[in-house]
Amino acid sequence: EATFNLSQPADEIDIFLSHSWRDSGLLKYLALCLYFNSVMAMVAALISGFLAFLLLRSGKITLLPFAPFMNVFNDFNEAMHAAGFRPSYDLNQFPWMDPAYKPIYAPSCQLVATSAFVIVLLLGHHLRAPVTMFLDKVCIHQTDPQRKAAGIQAIDQFLVRSKKMLICYNDDYFERLWCCFELAARASSGSEIEMLPLWRAPVVLVVLVGFTVSHIAEYVYLLFAGVGGSPNGFTIVSITFHAIPTLFMIEYTVLATRQKLKLTDTLRTFKITNTKCFDPSDRSIVEQAISSWFAGGGEPVSEPEGSSGLRGRAGVDTRAIERFEGDVRGGMTHRMIVSSVGKQPGLLRVRDLLLIFYTVWIPCSLDFSVRGVGRGNEMVVTFMIFVCPIAQGLSFLIVAWVASVS
């Protein structure tokens, strides 16, 4: 009763949340945080990174001590000469090629930006306009059988009044009877569908924070070993720490691709009889509701005299159930699910990759210019680190566009 009292009447609902009770509540929370707060979190990260840069540049604050960094372009020039390449122009004529130049670096801006991103991602919904959401555990009475049955029968009406249906998707979503019940209600009402794979948000967080930790590890090495340390030490530290988030992202991409293939196979072979339900007594309630939604014109399908088999257990209309199964296998519901997943690799979006690149690399580029003199190595490094993610982002968008039209 106390849980049901948390709900309130509404004429219109922004979000109808469909989920499996067996899935982790933390994963569902993170999925919703990424859906609602990711853009706000990225903007907050970039703004805080730029503000930190301006304050550090002005000398008004100091967050981390500076460590000596390599003269990247001079080292590159020496490597070219050592390999036998002799460019027709003298690279040493450029100010950033001064062999005596000693850049310094501290990942202050990136640390501030990443912290802002994580905080706003997890708590940003408290700063935005309220969103009305249908959550079955709260909006359907769980202890009074009559009120529970009335709420179940009215699910399609909740969806009619909902602008969008969000599906917290995991591999077993289409194996859960109640999830299929909500999907059937959506099919009968025509609401928009959007899939939220539950592992997407943890991957974005782990990869983004992982790259920041990698840069901090590089900084700690430079701070204690300095440029005069082991020539290969920085490379070993950098590769080791960058490998963790990189391999994690690759592993998730493979997992997401398999998840998409399984989703395609599940939709192709979908049958309501293969679904599972914690309480067996709920099955007849659910199937009767689906029967009423998919009966011709909203009425039960008329049965020819002497026919048998049109009605299954507890008066369930098997033809109506078959209509719903056909809709999932190849009808409008099938097309909406496939459209929501998209043609990107697996269930990983280009948007998530761009989110990681811009939130990590732009503040990182600013860190190289905090003590720059306007003519030296930092400004060039800043320019290249700033431009590279843009080029990478555009290439991802082009690949996604080609995949979508092919």
Language model features: what each stretch is:
Residues 1-406:
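The feature represents the membrane-entry module of six-transmembrane cation channels
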